[in-house]
A protein has these predicted regions:
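Catalytic alpha/large subunits of respiratory electron-transfer oxidoreductases
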Residues: 1-294
Protein backbone atom coordinates (compact mmCIF):
# COMPACT_ATOMS: atom_id res chain seq x y z
CA UNK A 1 0.00 0.00 0.00
CA UNK A 2 1.47 3.29 1.31
CA UNK A 3 0.07 5.35 -1.57
CA UNK A 4 -2.00 7.82 0.47
CA UNK A 5 0.29 8.53 3.39
CA UNK A 6 3.33 10.67 4.14
CA UNK A 7 6.92 9.92 3.24
CA UNK A 8 7.80 9.78 6.95
CA UNK A 9 5.25 7.01 7.52
CA UNK A 10 6.51 5.19 4.44
CA UNK A 11 10.04 5.26 5.85
CA UNK A 12 8.88 3.68 9.11
CA UNK A 13 6.99 1.02 7.14
CA UNK A 14 10.25 0.00 5.46
CA UNK A 15 11.95 -0.19 8.87
CA UNK A 16 9.17 -2.42 10.25
CA UNK A 17 9.40 -4.73 7.24
CA UNK A 18 13.16 -4.98 7.64
CA UNK A 19 12.80 -5.79 11.35
CA UNK A 20 10.26 -8.60 10.86
CA UNK A 21 11.94 -9.88 7.65
CA UNK A 22 8.77 -9.39 5.68
CA UNK A 23 7.68 -8.23 2.27
CA UNK A 24 6.90 -4.60 1.32
CA UNK A 25 5.12 -3.44 -1.80
CA UNK A 26 3.51 -0.21 -3.01
CA UNK A 27 0.50 0.30 -5.24
CA UNK A 28 2.92 0.81 -8.11
CA UNK A 29 2.98 -2.93 -8.70
CA UNK A 30 -0.64 -2.78 -9.94
CA UNK A 31 -0.28 0.61 -11.64
CA UNK A 32 2.90 2.16 -13.07
CA UNK A 33 5.06 -0.86 -12.27
CA UNK A 34 6.66 -0.92 -15.74
CA UNK A 35 7.70 2.70 -15.21
CA UNK A 36 9.39 1.72 -11.94
CA UNK A 37 11.38 -0.93 -13.79
CA UNK A 38 12.32 1.60 -16.48
CA UNK A 39 13.50 4.13 -13.88
CA UNK A 40 15.79 1.46 -12.47
CA UNK A 41 17.39 0.72 -15.84
CA UNK A 42 17.29 4.03 -17.73
CA UNK A 43 17.00 6.80 -15.15
CA UNK A 44 14.67 9.77 -15.22
CA UNK A 45 15.05 13.38 -16.37
CA UNK A 46 12.36 15.00 -14.26
CA UNK A 47 11.17 18.17 -12.54
CA UNK A 48 8.44 19.43 -10.27
CA UNK A 49 4.99 20.29 -11.60
CA UNK A 50 5.72 23.86 -10.53
CA UNK A 51 8.55 24.02 -13.04
CA UNK A 52 6.23 22.66 -15.71
CA UNK A 53 3.68 25.36 -14.92
CA UNK A 54 6.24 28.16 -15.00
CA UNK A 55 8.47 27.05 -17.87
CA UNK A 56 6.99 24.43 -20.22
CA UNK A 57 6.14 25.69 -23.71
CA UNK A 58 5.78 22.19 -25.21
CA UNK A 59 3.54 19.72 -23.37
CA UNK A 60 3.15 16.18 -24.70
CA UNK A 61 0.67 13.67 -23.27
CA UNK A 62 1.45 10.12 -24.34
CA UNK A 63 -0.95 7.25 -23.68
CA UNK A 64 -3.10 9.08 -21.16
CA UNK A 65 -6.44 10.85 -20.89
CA UNK A 66 -6.00 13.42 -18.09
CA UNK A 67 -9.24 15.22 -18.97
CA UNK A 68 -11.02 12.28 -17.32
CA UNK A 69 -8.36 10.69 -15.09
CA UNK A 70 -6.77 13.91 -13.72
CA UNK A 71 -9.30 16.68 -14.49
CA UNK A 72 -7.34 19.45 -12.70
CA UNK A 73 -4.05 18.64 -14.43
CA UNK A 74 -4.71 20.95 -17.39
CA UNK A 75 -5.90 23.87 -15.30
CA UNK A 76 -3.38 23.75 -12.47
CA UNK A 77 -0.12 22.68 -14.05
CA UNK A 78 0.26 22.03 -17.74
CA UNK A 79 -2.07 23.76 -20.19
CA UNK A 80 -3.96 26.88 -19.11
CA UNK A 81 -2.22 28.28 -15.97
CA UNK A 82 -0.11 31.42 -16.34
CA UNK A 83 3.48 30.92 -15.22
CA UNK A 84 6.64 32.96 -14.76
CA UNK A 85 7.84 32.29 -18.32
CA UNK A 86 4.41 31.45 -19.73
CA UNK A 87 2.48 34.63 -18.83
CA UNK A 88 -0.19 34.06 -21.49
CA UNK A 89 -1.09 30.55 -20.35
CA UNK A 90 -2.32 28.32 -23.17
CA UNK A 91 -1.20 30.82 -25.83
CA UNK A 92 2.41 30.27 -24.78
CA UNK A 93 2.20 26.48 -25.02
CA UNK A 94 1.91 23.84 -27.70
CA UNK A 95 0.00 20.77 -26.51
CA UNK A 96 0.48 17.42 -28.25
CA UNK A 97 -1.62 14.34 -27.52
CA UNK A 98 -0.43 10.89 -28.61
CA UNK A 99 -3.16 8.28 -28.19
CA UNK A 100 -4.71 5.46 -30.17
CA UNK A 101 -8.15 7.06 -30.01
CA UNK A 102 -9.65 10.52 -29.82
CA UNK A 103 -10.42 11.06 -26.13
CA UNK A 104 -11.82 14.08 -24.30
CA UNK A 105 -8.24 15.29 -23.81
CA UNK A 106 -8.00 15.87 -27.57
CA UNK A 107 -10.09 19.00 -27.09
CA UNK A 108 -7.13 20.95 -25.67
CA UNK A 109 -4.50 19.48 -28.02
CA UNK A 110 -2.98 21.55 -30.80
CA UNK A 111 -1.64 18.37 -32.39
CA UNK A 112 -3.29 14.93 -32.17
CA UNK A 113 -1.22 11.91 -33.19
CA UNK A 114 -3.01 8.57 -33.40
CA UNK A 115 -0.62 5.62 -33.74
CA UNK A 116 -1.65 2.03 -34.22
CA UNK A 117 -2.16 0.15 -30.92
CA UNK A 118 1.03 -1.45 -29.61
CA UNK A 119 3.39 0.61 -31.78
CA UNK A 120 4.61 3.09 -29.15
CA UNK A 121 8.09 1.60 -28.89
CA UNK A 122 8.71 1.80 -32.63
CA UNK A 123 7.57 5.44 -32.73
CA UNK A 124 9.69 6.43 -29.72
CA UNK A 125 12.75 4.73 -31.15
CA UNK A 126 12.18 6.49 -34.50
CA UNK A 127 11.92 9.83 -32.66
CA UNK A 128 15.22 9.13 -30.88
CA UNK A 129 16.86 8.56 -34.25
CA UNK A 130 15.36 11.73 -35.74
CA UNK A 131 16.34 13.82 -32.71
CA UNK A 132 19.95 12.67 -33.16
CA UNK A 133 19.84 13.64 -36.83
CA UNK A 134 19.87 10.11 -38.21
CA UNK A 135 18.01 9.15 -41.36
CA UNK A 136 15.56 6.33 -40.89
CA UNK A 137 16.14 4.98 -44.39
CA UNK A 138 17.73 5.64 -47.72
CA UNK A 139 14.20 5.63 -49.15
CA UNK A 140 11.87 8.33 -47.87
CA UNK A 141 9.30 7.00 -45.42
CA UNK A 142 10.81 3.56 -44.91
CA UNK A 143 12.76 1.79 -42.18
CA UNK A 144 16.15 0.41 -43.07
CA UNK A 145 14.64 -3.03 -43.57
CA UNK A 146 12.16 -1.75 -46.14
CA UNK A 147 8.98 -1.46 -44.07
CA UNK A 148 6.92 1.68 -44.63
CA UNK A 149 6.80 3.72 -41.42
CA UNK A 150 3.23 4.88 -41.81
CA UNK A 151 1.98 1.39 -42.63
CA UNK A 152 3.84 -0.04 -39.63
CA UNK A 153 2.99 2.57 -36.97
CA UNK A 154 0.07 4.58 -38.36
CA UNK A 155 2.14 7.78 -38.16
CA UNK A 156 3.84 9.35 -41.18
CA UNK A 157 7.53 10.21 -41.30
CA UNK A 158 6.56 13.84 -41.91
CA UNK A 159 4.58 13.92 -38.65
CA UNK A 160 7.42 12.30 -36.70
CA UNK A 161 9.98 14.69 -38.17
CA UNK A 162 7.82 17.70 -37.29
CA UNK A 163 7.41 16.45 -33.71
CA UNK A 164 11.14 15.80 -33.35
CA UNK A 165 11.93 19.34 -34.53
CA UNK A 166 9.37 20.84 -32.15
CA UNK A 167 10.95 18.89 -29.30
CA UNK A 168 14.46 20.06 -30.15
CA UNK A 169 13.48 23.71 -30.62
CA UNK A 170 11.25 24.30 -27.58
CA UNK A 171 12.56 26.16 -24.50
CA UNK A 172 11.27 23.64 -21.96
CA UNK A 173 9.46 20.46 -22.91
CA UNK A 174 7.67 17.83 -20.87
CA UNK A 175 6.50 14.31 -21.71
CA UNK A 176 3.61 13.16 -19.53
CA UNK A 177 2.98 9.44 -20.01
CA UNK A 178 0.13 7.29 -18.79
CA UNK A 179 -0.83 3.64 -18.57
CA UNK A 180 -1.76 3.60 -22.24
CA UNK A 181 2.00 3.48 -22.76
CA UNK A 182 3.09 1.34 -19.82
CA UNK A 183 0.38 -1.32 -19.92
CA UNK A 184 0.47 -2.13 -23.63
CA UNK A 185 2.82 -4.36 -25.62
CA UNK A 186 6.38 -3.53 -24.61
CA UNK A 187 5.59 -2.54 -21.00
CA UNK A 188 8.76 -1.23 -19.33
CA UNK A 189 10.58 -1.09 -22.68
CA UNK A 190 8.04 1.53 -23.78
CA UNK A 191 8.64 3.58 -20.63
CA UNK A 192 12.38 3.18 -21.02
CA UNK A 193 12.28 4.39 -24.62
CA UNK A 194 10.31 7.49 -23.62
CA UNK A 195 12.64 8.25 -20.70
CA UNK A 196 15.67 7.79 -22.96
CA UNK A 197 14.10 10.16 -25.51
CA UNK A 198 13.71 12.85 -22.83
CA UNK A 199 17.34 12.37 -21.80
CA UNK A 200 18.51 12.60 -25.44
CA UNK A 201 16.63 15.89 -25.89
CA UNK A 202 18.61 17.53 -23.09
CA UNK A 203 21.50 17.79 -25.54
CA UNK A 204 19.46 20.44 -27.37
CA UNK A 205 17.07 21.94 -24.80
CA UNK A 206 15.58 21.34 -21.35
CA UNK A 207 13.27 18.33 -21.46
CA UNK A 208 11.69 16.23 -18.71
CA UNK A 209 9.45 13.16 -18.47
CA UNK A 210 6.83 12.51 -15.81
CA UNK A 211 4.37 9.64 -15.34
CA UNK A 212 0.76 10.73 -14.84
CA UNK A 213 0.01 8.72 -11.74
CA UNK A 214 -2.86 8.12 -9.37
CA UNK A 215 -3.13 8.19 -5.58
CA UNK A 216 -1.84 10.91 -3.28
CA UNK A 217 1.79 9.98 -2.67
CA UNK A 218 2.50 6.84 -4.64
CA UNK A 219 5.57 8.45 -6.21
CA UNK A 220 6.80 9.28 -2.71
CA UNK A 221 6.32 5.64 -1.69
CA UNK A 222 8.48 4.47 -4.60
CA UNK A 223 11.14 7.05 -3.84
CA UNK A 224 11.27 6.19 -0.13
CA UNK A 225 11.38 2.42 -0.70
CA UNK A 226 14.07 2.88 -3.37
CA UNK A 227 16.04 5.19 -1.06
CA UNK A 228 15.91 2.72 1.81
CA UNK A 229 16.32 -0.57 -0.11
CA UNK A 230 17.62 0.22 -3.59
CA UNK A 231 14.41 -1.03 -5.22
CA UNK A 232 11.12 0.82 -5.85
CA UNK A 233 8.50 -1.83 -4.94
CA UNK A 234 8.06 -5.56 -4.36
CA UNK A 235 10.96 -5.88 -1.89
CA UNK A 236 11.53 -8.96 0.30
CA UNK A 237 13.64 -9.05 3.50
CA UNK A 238 13.26 -12.73 4.39
CA UNK A 239 17.00 -13.37 4.07
CA UNK A 240 17.95 -10.32 6.10
CA UNK A 241 18.70 -8.12 3.10
CA UNK A 242 16.48 -6.59 0.39
CA UNK A 243 15.65 -8.64 -2.70
CA UNK A 244 13.63 -7.43 -5.68
CA UNK A 245 11.67 -9.74 -7.96
CA UNK A 246 8.42 -8.52 -9.56
CA UNK A 247 6.14 -11.49 -10.13
CA UNK A 248 7.24 -13.13 -6.88
CA UNK A 249 7.49 -10.43 -4.21
CA UNK A 250 4.75 -8.14 -5.55
CA UNK A 251 1.58 -8.25 -3.47
CA UNK A 252 -0.82 -9.81 -5.98
CA UNK A 253 1.60 -12.67 -6.56
CA UNK A 254 2.42 -13.11 -2.87
CA UNK A 255 -1.27 -13.39 -2.03
CA UNK A 256 -2.28 -15.43 -5.08
CA UNK A 257 0.47 -17.97 -4.38
CA UNK A 258 -0.55 -18.22 -0.72
CA UNK A 259 2.87 -17.08 0.53
CA UNK A 260 1.65 -14.41 2.97
CA UNK A 261 0.44 -15.45 6.44
CA UNK A 262 -0.48 -11.91 7.60
CA UNK A 263 -1.02 -8.54 5.96
CA UNK A 264 -0.63 -4.91 7.02
CA UNK A 265 -2.45 -2.62 4.59
CA UNK A 266 -1.53 1.05 4.90
CA UNK A 267 -3.43 3.88 3.21
CA UNK A 268 -4.64 1.91 0.19
CA UNK A 269 -7.55 -0.24 -0.93
CA UNK A 270 -6.45 -3.54 -2.50
CA UNK A 271 -9.99 -4.89 -2.29
CA UNK A 272 -11.07 -2.53 -5.08
CA UNK A 273 -8.68 -3.81 -7.74
CA UNK A 274 -6.95 -7.06 -6.71
CA UNK A 275 -7.91 -10.29 -8.52
CA UNK A 276 -10.29 -12.73 -6.83
CA UNK A 277 -7.58 -15.27 -5.98
CA UNK A 278 -5.58 -12.67 -4.07
CA UNK A 279 -8.67 -11.38 -2.23
CA UNK A 280 -9.70 -14.92 -1.28
CA UNK A 281 -6.33 -15.50 0.38
CA UNK A 282 -6.56 -12.12 2.10
CA UNK A 283 -9.84 -13.27 3.69
CA UNK A 284 -8.11 -16.28 5.24
CA UNK A 285 -5.20 -14.52 6.99
CA UNK A 286 -4.98 -11.89 9.76
CA UNK A 287 -5.24 -8.39 8.27
CA UNK A 288 -4.48 -5.03 9.88
CA UNK A 289 -5.67 -1.95 8.00
CA UNK A 290 -4.44 1.59 8.70
CA UNK A 291 -6.60 4.05 6.79
CA UNK A 292 -8.48 7.28 7.29
CA UNK A 293 -11.78 5.72 6.23
CA UNK A 294 -13.42 2.33 6.56
Amino acid sequence: GLSDTTSEAQRHAVAITDYIKGNIDTTTSVCHGPSGLAFQSVGESTSTLGEVKNRADLVIYWGGNPAESHPRHFGRYAVTPKGMFTPNGKKDRTVVLVDVRKTKSAGVADILIRPKPGKDFEILWALRALVKGNKLSANEGEWFWGVNIEEETGVSLETLTDLAERMKNCRFGVLFFGMGLTMTRGRHFNSGALLALATDLNKYTHFVAKPVRGHGNVTGADNVVAWQTGYPFGVNFSRGYPRFNPGEFTTVDTLSNGDADAALIIASDPGSNFPKKAIDHLKNIPVITLDTKS
